[in-house]
Every structure is written in C-alpha cells, then in structure tokens.
C-alpha cells in the first residue's frame, strides 16, 4: 500500500501549506532527542502521506514514519463570556537514522 502512495504526486502549493509551524516545547525536545522525531502543527485535513511529502520537499530529509493526533480545543472563560480555543492537529515525524533536522537556526 505504501509503495503505491509514495509514487502519488501532490500539489506543491498544497504541500507548502500543510506544515503550519514547528512545535518547540519541553516534551517535543525530549522526544526529538530520544527518537529522532520532529513535532509539527499541521492543517486539520492533512493526511500522513501529505505530511511526509511536505517534510521531504521542504527540508530535504528522509522520513521513516508519521504519527498524527488531534487535540481538542479547551473551553476558556473571560469574565462572563465563554470562548473556545481552536482544535489542533499535531504530527510527530520520525526521521530515518542518520538524518537530522535543525529547527533552532543555530549552526552546529
């Protein structure tokens, strides 16, 4: 199944929009150190195949796997008014051994 999907062509404009932002937190840094995985905030309707293709296109690295999860937005109050934060879709992109992706901007 993956061999068929890896040959599928994606729209390059769409791939440039799939990755919204990298997530830099304590947990994301710990996961990056242990498992060579990078965490991204992605579009709600992005698929694993699109995320993999977008990372390979933008950063020129080989991707081993992609794990995706949806985070429900929290309900928040400000005085009497009740609001809700947006839902977030998060992707953990595991790179193949020997590959490195530096999002910090500092050169090694």
Swiss-Prot record:
Cystine crosslinks: none
MF terms in GO: rRNA binding; structural constituent of ribosome
Pfam families: Ribosomal_L23
Biological function: One of the early assembly proteins it binds 23S rRNA. One of the proteins that surrounds the polypeptide exit tunnel on the outside of the ribosome. Forms the main docking site for trigger factor binding to the ribosome.
PANTHER family in UniProt: 60S RIBOSOMAL PROTEIN L23A
Similarity-based family: Belongs to the universal ribosomal protein uL23 family.
Name of the protein in question: Large ribosomal subunit protein uL23
Native species: Polaromonas sp. (strain JS666 / ATCC BAA-500)
Gene name, Swiss-Prot/TrEMBL: rplW
């Amino acid at each position: 199944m993956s061999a068929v999907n890896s040959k599928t062509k994606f729209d390059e404009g769409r791939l440039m929009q799939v990755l919204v932002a990298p997530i830099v937190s304590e947990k994301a840094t710990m996961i990056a150190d242990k498992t060579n995985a990078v965490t991204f905030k992605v579009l709600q309707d992005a698929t694993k195949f699109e995320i993999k293709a977008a990372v390979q296109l933008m950063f020129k690295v080989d991707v081993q796997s992609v794990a995706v999860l949806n985070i429900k937005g929290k309900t928040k109050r400000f005085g009497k008014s009740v609001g809700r934060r947006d839902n977030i879709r998060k992707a953990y992109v595991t790179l193949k051994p020997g590959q490195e992706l530096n999002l910090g901007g500092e050169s090694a």
